[in-house]
């Protein structure tokens, strides 16, 4: 009715602007969508502006008409970013899309889940269920924070190529750091589970991503040498978790013993065994069970740690860093060194405290995280 009233009262002699502020705060999701789909006033004389945080509205919105407003790092200036600015040109020249517009493809792809791309402060793109399930669990267990707490969106793109999604992050479009996580599937001589074709595809994928985004400061790619499952179990400290998954899944003791022996044997045997277990269980369920086995001895593989550092470099505030430091220190037996570090993480200069933590606990996973972070600064 308000739309009808607005149409009736409009003045043809002036510009008419209608502003709708955060409809999700007042109306149900389904009504939001209906409102948006049926929001039709004459384009000749009226402009409609809608502000929203709703992923449901971004799902039905034409991405060509979406702008993202963000407060810059100095907290005084807002910047407006258009996700599709020069996007079709990029698709045509860089991705060689002949008869397709990249913006149209993305419009069809962006559902309520993947619209997190537009609202997250940083993004990690992954290609499978295993990464989507295991990475958030590893971060929470290792550092005591969730990806949601720091505004990092982890998106499982499934069978969609990374380059189509990552293209919205650039100087011309969204100013968000985006980490691409993918497997190289490197060939393993003597393995019965390895494929030369998969290894070739891994090299081709790396070359393509490095070429496309090598000069894009907002996007970087991080590669598992083999696969998530293999790179995870290659860390000695992580093998006990995989052993527990084996004990949990299989009932025959001979099968359990064989897999556990292989996990701690040669690399080829470990490679074949862990991929067999993941296939038997299904990679998503394997990651789910594995997530429940994690404890404070966990080691996050380097490529995942670096991807987390890259995506979070704009959002790791001082309070978050202090929270992480205290969480990690709580895992240690209390002594004078640990007590002093806790005190400094509470009230000390954060940069000096990080340096002291790294000097006194050089083998801690958090020290490796801090070092990766320093390399980007």
PLM region spans:
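Loop/turn-to-beta-strand initiation segments
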Residues: 14-17, 44-49
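H-loop (His-switch) motif in ABC-type P-loop NTPases
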Residues: 51-54
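Conserved catalytic segment of ABC-fold P-loop ATPases
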Residues: 47, 60-68
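GG-anchored amphipathic helix commonly corresponding to the ABC/SMC/Rad50 NBD signature/C-loop
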Residues: 1-18
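Acidic, divalent-metal-binding catalytic cores of TOPRIM
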Residues: 72-377
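Conserved hydrophobic alpha-helix in the ABC-type ATPase nucleotide-binding domain
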Residues: 34-35
């Amino acid at each position: 009715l308000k739309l009808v009233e607005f149409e009736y009262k409009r003045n043809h002699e002036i510009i008419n602007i209608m502003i709708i502020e955060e409809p999700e705060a007042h109306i149900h999701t389904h009504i939001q969508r209906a409102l948006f789909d049926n929001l039709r006033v004459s384009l000749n004389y009226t402009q409609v502006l809608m502000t929203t945080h709703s992923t449901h509205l971004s799902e039905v919105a034409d991405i060509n008409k979406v702008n993202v407003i963000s407060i810059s790092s100095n907290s005084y200036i807002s910047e407006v970013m258009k996700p599709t600015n020069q996007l079709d040109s990029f698709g045509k020249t860089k991705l060689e899309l002949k008869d397709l517009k990249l913006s149209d493809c993305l419009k069809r792809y962006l559902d309520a889940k993947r619209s997190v791309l537009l609202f997250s402060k940083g993004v990690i793109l992954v290609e499978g269920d295993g990464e989507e399930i295991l990475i958030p669990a590893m971060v929470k267990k290792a550092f005591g924070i969730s990806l949601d707490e720091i505004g990092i969106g982890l998106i499982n793109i499934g069978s969609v190529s990374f380059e189509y999604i990552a293209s919205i992050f650039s100087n011309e479009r969204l100013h968000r750091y985006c980490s691409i996580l993918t497997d190289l599937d490197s060939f393993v001589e003597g393995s019965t589970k390895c494929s030369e074709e998969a290894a070739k595809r891994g090299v081709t994928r790396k070359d393509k991503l490095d070429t496309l985004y090598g000069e894009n400061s907002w996007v970087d790619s991080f590669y598992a040498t083999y696969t998530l499952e293999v790179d995870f179990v290659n860390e000695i400290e992580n093998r006990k978790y995989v052993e527990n998954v084996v004990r949990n899944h299989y009932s025959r003791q001979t099968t359990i013993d064989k897999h556990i022996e292989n996990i701690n044997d040669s690399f080829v045997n470990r490679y074949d065994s862990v991929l067999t277990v993941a296939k038997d269980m299904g990679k998503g369920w394997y990651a789910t069970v594995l997530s429940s086995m994690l404890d404070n001895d966990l080691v996050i593989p380097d490529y995942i740690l670096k991807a987390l550092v890259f995506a979070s470099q704009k959002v790791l505030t001082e309070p978050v860093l202090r929270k992480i430091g205290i969480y990690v220190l709580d895992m240690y037996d209390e002594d004078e060194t640990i007590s002093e570090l806790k005190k400094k993480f509470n009230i000390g200069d954060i940069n000096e405290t990080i340096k002291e933590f790294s000097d006194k606990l050089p083998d801690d996973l958090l020290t490796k995280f801090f070092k990766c972070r320093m390399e980007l600064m």
